[in-house]
Amino acid sequence: KKTENLILCSGKVYYDLLEAREGIRNSKSTIIRVEQFYPFDKAKFQEVVAPYAKAKRIVWCQEEPYNMGAWNFLFPIFEEMLGRRPYFAGRTATASPATGSLTLHKIEQAALVADALDQTQTSHT
């Protein structure tokens, strides 16, 4: 299958992405886990992503808010290695790493997974 959407992620969100992708008919998303941030193995990363370098969309997906987690460390490396800045799929910037509400957490989690898989429904209300 041809990859149109390359998703880079780390940790538990990988399993959420896999589960959601299984429910999408004819998904053109490839998911790659990045688990070693430092020292970052640029040669290994290049080897793993090379077959997907021409994907229309490259995404970094994380559960943490925009201003937390691995994004701020990794996006300059990804930009250098991929020649473009990946799209960020995750929670908006916030002072707290958690919502404090399980219901809201589940809603946000489903939204960031759908966003990463390019399955968001745009509302025009």
Task: Identify what each model region corresponds to.
Residues 1-4, 25-26, 53-55, 83:
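Short, well-ordered loop/turn elements at secondary-structure boundaries
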Residues 62-125:
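Peripheral docking tails and interdomain loops at the edges
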Residues 25, 57, 121-125:
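Residue-level signal for secondary-structure boundary elements
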Residues 9, 45-48, 52-66, 73:
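Hydrophobic/aromatic-rich, well-ordered segments within soluble, folded domains that form packed cores
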Residues 1-9, 13:
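Active-site phosphate/pyrophosphate-binding segments
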Residues 9-11, 33-36, 41, 61-65, ...:
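Active-site proximal loops enriched in glycine and acidic residues that flank catalytic Cys/His/Asp
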Residues 2-4, 30-33, 56-61:
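Glycine- and acidic
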Residues 14, 18-54:
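Generic long, charged, amphipathic alpha-helical segments
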